[in-house]
Amino acid sequence: MSIITDVYAREVLDSRGNPTLEVEVYTESGAFGRGMVPSGASTGEHEAVELRDGDKARYGGLGTQKAVDNVNNVIAEHIIGFDVRDQQGIDRAMIALDGTPNKGKLGANAILGVSIAVARAAADYLEVPLYSYLGGFNTKVLPTPMMNIINGGSHSDAPIAFQEFMIVPAGAPTFKEALRWGAEIFHALKKILKERGLETAVGDEGGFAPRFDGTEDGVETIIKAIEAAGYVPGKDVFIGLDCASSEFYDAERKVYDYTKFEGEGAAVRTAAEQIDYLEELVNKYPIITIEDGMDENDWDGWKALTERLGDKVQLVGDDFFVTNTAYLEKGIAEHAANSILIKVNQIGTLTETFDAIEMAKEAGYTAVVSHRSGETEDSTIADIAVATNAGQIKTGSLSRTDRIAKYNQLLRIEDQLGEVAEYRGLKSFYNLKK
C-alpha cells in the first residue's frame, strides 16, 4: 500500500514570476505528496545545477520544461515501485541515475521536487505531520528566526553592497512571541523610513530596499526601529548581516569592490581590510551573525576571519559551503566559519540536506535552515528546521505570502507540539563563546 504508483511534474511560477517545478507523488493507498522547488538570485559557484531550458523565446530562457520532462519521463519510471518511506533509497537512486557530481544531467530542481514530494507522501501515508515523520519522537525545537527586513545587494535595487540586514529576536520566550516582536519592528521600521522620506517598497524577500547612506545607516536605522517597537538591541533583539561577499569580490584584483553596488566613491577593500571592517561593525553594533563575510573561494580570508571573530559572532557559510558535506568537511578541518546555511536546492535531496546538518552539529557548527530569494508557498523548510532541531531559520521578512507561509507553518507546529515545544533563542547560538 505504501508503494509509489505515480510521479508527475508540472511547471509553475515562483515568487519572482519565474518558472519552477511542482512535483506530485502518489501511492497505492492514495497517499499523496507535493513538493515545490525554490530558486536563488545570488548563487554559489559550486551549487548543484538548476536545469533551465535556455529558450529565449519562452520565459526569457528560464523555462523548466526540460526538468519537468526529466521527472515525468526518466525519474518516474525508476522510482515507481519504491516504498515511499524509503527516502534514502529513493534519493540515492536519483543521484545514481543522474550520475554527475552536480546533478547537471537531470537537474537538481527535478530531483529535489521529487525528494520533497516523496517525503510528504510518506508523511501522508503514515498520517503524521511532515516534521514528525522527518525528525522522529524527539522533534521539539522551534527555530530562532533571522528576519531580513532590509534587502540590498542582488536582492534589490538599493545601493548597498550587503545583501541582507536581519533582526534576530533571540530574547523572546517562544517562537510565537519572536514572530510578534519581528512584525512590530518591521512596522516600526516602515514608519521611520516614511518619516525620512525613504522608499518603503520591498525586495525579493519582503524587506525594505531604501537608499540608505551606506551599511552603518542601515544598521543604525534598524536599531532605532527595535527601540521604537519597545525592545532592547543586544538583549531582546540582535542584528544579522548577509554580506554575500562573492557578489562584489573581484577575483582578478583580489579585492572586495563595494562600487559594484554602491557606486563611485565606495570602498574597495583587501581581504585584511574586509576583516577589519567586519570586526569594526561587530564591535560597534549588537551583531550576532554574519553570513558570507568573505568570498566563496577566499579560504585564507575565511580562516583569518574565523580566527579573529569566530568566538563572538556566528560566521555562516552559504556560497562558501553550498550545503555540501565535502566543502563543510574541509571547512571544519581548516577551522573556517562556524556555521552552515542549509538550502535544500543547493544540494538537491533531503537525504544530503540532513547529512549536512548532522555533520555540522557533530563538529559544533550551527546549521541555519534557509529559504531562497525565489520562493513558493511550499513550507517544507519550516518542517525541516523543527525535524532536525536545527535551532535557527532564515526565511525572509514579515511581508509577502511566500515568506509568511513558513512562519505560519512554524506557528502551527508550535501549537501542535504544545508544552513539548522549545524556543531556545540565544542558546541556539551554541557555537559562540561570549
Swiss-Prot record:
Give binding positions for Mg(2+): 242, 291, 318
- Where found, per UniProt? Cytoplasm; Secreted; Cell surface
From what organism does this protein derive?
Answer: Streptococcus thermophilus (strain ATCC BAA-250 / LMG 18311)
Per its database record, what is this protein's job? Answer: Catalyzes the reversible conversion of 2-phosphoglycerate (2-PG) into phosphoenolpyruvate (PEP). It is essential for the degradation of carbohydrates via glycolysis.
Q: Which GO terms describe its cellular component?
A: cell surface; extracellular region; peptidoglycan-based cell wall; phosphopyruvate hydratase complex
The text of the family note is: Belongs to the enolase family.
One molecular function GO term is: phosphopyruvate hydratase activity
**Which top EC class is named for this enzyme in its record?**
lyase
Descriptive protein name: Enolase
Pathway this chain belongs to: Carbohydrate degradation; glycolysis; pyruvate from D-glyceraldehyde 3-phosphate: step 4/5
Residues forming the catalytic site: 205, 343
Residues binding (2R)-2-phosphoglycerate: 163, 343, 372-373, 394
* UniProt keyword list: Cytoplasm, Glycolysis, Lyase, Magnesium, Metal-binding, Secreted
How does the cofactor bind to this protein, according to its record? Answer: Binds a second Mg(2+) ion via substrate during catalysis.
Lineage, top ranks: Bacteria, Bacillati, Bacillota, Bacilli, Lactobacillales
Q: Does the keyword Endoplasmic reticulum apply?
A: no
Which Gene Ontology BP annotations are present? glycolytic process
For whether the record's keyword set contains Electron transport, the answer is no
